[in-house]
Amino acid sequence: MDRVLGCVFAGAVHDYFSGMLSVRNGGASVPNLTGKYLGAPVKHFMNALALVLLVLVGVVFVISPAGLLTNLTMDNLGESMNLDRGHTLVVWTTVIFLYYIIATLIPIDKIIGRVYPLFGALLLFMSFGMFFALLFEDKALFHSVGEMSFSKFFENLHPTGLPIWPLIFVTIACGAVSGFHATQSPLMARCMENEKEGRFVFYGAMIGEGIIALIWCMVGLTFYNSPAEMNEAINMGTPSKVVYDSATQMLGYFGGILAVLGVVVLPITSGDTSFRAARLIIAEFFKIDQKNLVKRLMIAVPLFVVGFIITKLDFQVLWRYFGWANQTTAMVMLWTAAAYLYRYHKFHWICTIPAIFMTMVSATFLAYAKIGFGLAYDTAVWVGVGLTALATVCFFTMLKPIADGDPDSETNPA
């Protein structure tokens, strides 16, 4: 339920406005947009936050596809070629990193633009394949869903009893709302030929991602007999094990391999552009021209060194940091879009309400989580409520609608 509502009313709205504001401002990056509509202090905060997020995206989206490809390799070639799992994982991690380096340095139409049609085909096969497998698989896959009532959607089924609020809204960091998408909007905005494409490119793409997320949510609910059983599978490796086991068992050997490759596409198509966007943000901040390959390497090499070091950390911890940074970026972008609508006398609540909600999610998570301040749950919730109220008051008191006839209103078509 949270994926559906979040995707339609928050995630897709977030993606649409981040994209269209970038289009209206000549392909401007998220930090520049936040600086224009929320002020310089927010721009500096967003520069740092976006950079952290992009590096974390690149790292977590190396680990998960490398794990899936390692499982494929070991199951098919491991015994016959006497392969070591650890060494195989290092090889795939290195291969993915090398691809990211090339994609970061080479113009977007030379590498990414050429391989994305193939990636898209794999993604479509994975999505439709898993969906129809859920419908027509012989075994009773829907046993756990069939027993659910509406009230059970609000029942906490976490094996260790962790609170639903706000953790679920940070754990589901991409299928409902994703601040990472805002960092990629300039790449798409600069490629668009007509503003009319925005609804399909930005809003529609997020709805598509939400559908894929729902398909895998159903797989998680039905493939395992209980949340505890799925959690045990995750603890044996990473979430990639759940993907691999379910795909190969539900679609057979060949279909499962194609589905796994389709899932591999998802993180790789995020990771390859994340380091590129990080390079561009740094170059923009320090005003380093990027036409020269040497100057690109000056930024890219340190980024990849830092990223490779971070891959050695625990995946679960990395995912929590990524989730928080992702949702906090979305929060700031939603406030930015709300500020644009509010200042130009538009119906701002379509962005303001999601912004308020995401502020409470991010603030409460940071206050409660062990990777944050580790406060008691009740205290953390009240901290989240207080900070959200403060942000809302600041929004309406510090921002002023632009008066009719103001010269700025003519340079920003409403």
Regions found by a protein language model. Give the residues of each.
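Flexible loop linkers connecting adjacent transmembrane helices
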Residues: 5, 13-42, 77, 190, ...
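Helix-loop-helix module between adjacent transmembrane segments
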Residues: 6, 10-26, 30-104, 133, ...
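Extracellular/periplasmic helix-exit of transmembrane alpha-helices
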Residues: 19, 134-151, 203-245
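Loop-to-transmembrane helix boundary motifs in multi-pass membrane proteins
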Residues: 40-47, 51, 85-95, 204-213, ...
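Hydrophobic alpha-helical segments and their helix-loop junctions in multi-pass secondary transporters
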Residues: 58-75, 79, 87-94, 99-104, ...
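C-terminal membrane-solvent junction of multi-pass transporters and transport-like membrane proteins
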Residues: 85-89, 94, 108, 112-119, ...
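Hydrophobic core of alpha-helical transmembrane segments in multi-pass integral membrane proteins
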Residues: 98, 127, 304-309, 384-397
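Hydrophobic, membrane-embedded alpha-helices of multi-pass small-molecule transporters
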Residues: 131-139, 152-216, 261-270
